[in-house]
């Protein structure tokens, strides 16, 4: 093989690989075989604000994330540790005002056009241990226990389709973040127990420490002691769900119902809070393989007396492979609506957020996603003007 041909093959292998940084000359595969999985990603979102309360403008938000996963059985070379793993995640988000489109839009934080506006700077997100019983009551991984410095958002109300979007309401907070610390910047001590009595049914519960102002950028995700002057409390989440397949095409779906109790009683927070939610994702039509149309929806209720939002709902559609020869591209559109509660401004009504986009998959490790966002009554009243945004969501996995 000529040197030129070898270079072309190497470039093609890199482009069609799993990571931008490649296989590290074989080192990545070697360490993964020993139970060490180290990976990272970069995300950037450009917001071209066409109109808003503060007029036209621009913003560019960025996030760098790093993960380290450890497989105890492979590390120790002992099969008796099969199912035990450790994990660590760290993150950086651009803290500058030029990164936050809400400088112009002035929306309630739940309806921030950017999912990367909270918990800025360097931040420790989570670390801990997870044990999945290899077989429990005849079900693979039928019992899973997780404990450590955790993020409830990664364990509950998981909607992968909603997290394709750039805005905060769908991509991170999922309604709950409008009333309690819940989104992608909230970390706390806790434990989660998940049981699958049968293959397609699960029941899980999580108990966490609640504390004052947990997503403050100044604490860097290191607020292990919680609040000293304000006092700590308990945060419980419970959820049950099913993962059925429908029809001759065996169209996959996921449906769940859950609730929470957030116990933190201080003057600023407004006392203990609770709420209930239900969500579903369903493939409704299959074109070929993974190609086809999927739908998702979520609803969330909370008492209006001490919550900013008494009701929130989101729904959307995602079509994979609509354009010929672009089998992995995604066409998406969704809407989110939040009804303000008594804890918000007395005159507040609803905010409505619409986002539509098209994700171009360049390869396994990079995408470009142009999108449009429309925000009606961004802060719940006509006092803040509507907003229109054109943007581009970029991603690279390394």
Model segments located where?
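Short loop/turn motifs that connect adjacent beta-strands in outer-membrane beta-barrel proteins
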Residues: 4-7, 21-38, 71-86, 134-143, ...
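Transmembrane beta-strand segments of Gram-negative outer membrane beta-barrel proteins
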Residues: 8-14, 28-50, 86-88, 96, ...
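Transmembrane beta-barrel strands of outer-membrane/channel proteins
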Residues: 38-46, 86-92, 145-149, 203-209, ...
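Solvent-exposed loop/turn segments connecting transmembrane beta-strands
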Residues: 56-58, 230-231, 267-271, 301-312, ...
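Outer membrane beta-barrel
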Residues: 57, 61-213, 307-343
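Membrane-embedded beta-strands of outer-membrane beta-barrel proteins
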Residues: 66-68, 127, 191, 238-240, ...
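Long, well-ordered mid-to-C-terminal structural blocks that present hydrophobic/aromatic surfaces
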Residues: 243-325
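Outer-membrane beta-barrel "beta-signal"
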Residues: 386-398
């Amino acid at each position: 093989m000529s040197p030129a041909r070898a270079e072309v093959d190497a470039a093609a292998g890199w482009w069609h690989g799993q990571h931008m940084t490649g296989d590290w000359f074989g080192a990545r595969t070697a360490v993964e075989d020993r139970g060490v999985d180290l990976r990272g990603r970069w995300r950037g979102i450009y917001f071209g604000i066409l109109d808003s309360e503060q007029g036209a403008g621009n913003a560019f938000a960025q996030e760098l994330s790093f993960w380290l996963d450890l497989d105890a059985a492979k590390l120790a070379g002992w099969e008796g540790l099969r199912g035990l793993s450790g994990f660590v995640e760290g993150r950086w988000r651009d803290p500058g005002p030029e990164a936050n489109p809400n400088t112009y839009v002035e929306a309630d934080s739940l309806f921030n056009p950017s999912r990367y506006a909270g918990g800025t700077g360097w931040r420790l997100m989570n670390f801990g241990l997870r044990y999945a019983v290899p077989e429990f009551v005849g079900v693979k991984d039928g019992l899973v226990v997780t404990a450590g410095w955790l993020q409830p958002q990664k364990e509950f109300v998981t909607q992968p389709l909603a997290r394709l979007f750039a805005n905060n309401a769908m991509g991170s907070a999922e309604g709950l973040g409008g009333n309690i610390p819940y989104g992608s910047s909230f970390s706390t001590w806790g434990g989660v127990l998940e049981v699958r009595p049968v293959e397609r049914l699960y029941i899980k519960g999580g108990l966490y420490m609640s504390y004052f102002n947990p997503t403050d950028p100044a604490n860097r995700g290191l607020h292990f002691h919680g609040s000293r002057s304000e006092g700590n409390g308990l945060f419980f989440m419970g959820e049950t769900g099913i993962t059925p397949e429908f029809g001759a095409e065996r169209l996959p779906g996921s449906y769940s119902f859950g609730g929470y109790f957030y116990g933190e009683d201080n003057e600023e927070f407004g006392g203990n809070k609770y709420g209930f939610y239900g969500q579903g994702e369903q493939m409704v039509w299959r074109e070929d393989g993974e190609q086809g149309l999927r739908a998702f929806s979520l609803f969330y209720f909370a008492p209006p007396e001490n919550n900013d939002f008494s009701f929130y709902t989101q729904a959307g559609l995602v079509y994979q492979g609509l354009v010929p020869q672009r089998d992995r591209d995604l066409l998406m559109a969704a809407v989110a609506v939040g009804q303000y509660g008594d804890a918000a401004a007395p005159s507040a009504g609803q905010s409505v957020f619409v986002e539509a986009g098209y994700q171009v998959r360049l390869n396994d490790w990079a995408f470009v996603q142009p999108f449009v966002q429309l925000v009606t009554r961004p802060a719940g009243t006509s006092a803040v003007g509507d907003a229109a945004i054109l943007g581009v969501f970029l991603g690279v996995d390394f």
